[in-house]
Amino acid sequence: MTQEIYEYANKIERALRNLPEYKKVVAAKEDIEKDSEASNIFEEFFKLQAKLKEMIQNGQTPSNEEQETIHQLSSKIESNELLKAYFEAQQSLSVYINDIERIIFNPLKDLI
């Protein structure tokens, strides 16, 4: 039985990789990597996201300057078609991820 659960998990992984939505995210990321402007904005976004996550974990809130940086970066993302396509594809894929997560963790609710 223990081995079986890992087999199911691996099947889910393979199924996710075969989803058209997953493939769209992969293709969108490849397009970003080919474009230096989009790639720079993309990298900047993930650095800022990590910084904000750390701040929140430490109970800090972004300063006015940091909030302005967030706003400017959001505008850059919205105006870049490659980045917009990537985040839209991510959003479509996240529907599956959220549903799968809900299904997997549903039995754990019984333990609380």
Swiss-Prot record:
Cross-referenced Gene3D superfamilies: YheA/YmcA-like
Family: Belongs to the UPF0342 family.
NCBIfam families listed in its UniProt record: PRK13676.1-1
One Pfam family, short name: Com_YlbF
Designated name of the protein: UPF0342 protein SUB0718
Superkingdom of origin: Bacteria
InterPro entries xrefs: Com_YlbF, YheA/YmcA-like_dom_sf
TM regions (residue ranges): none
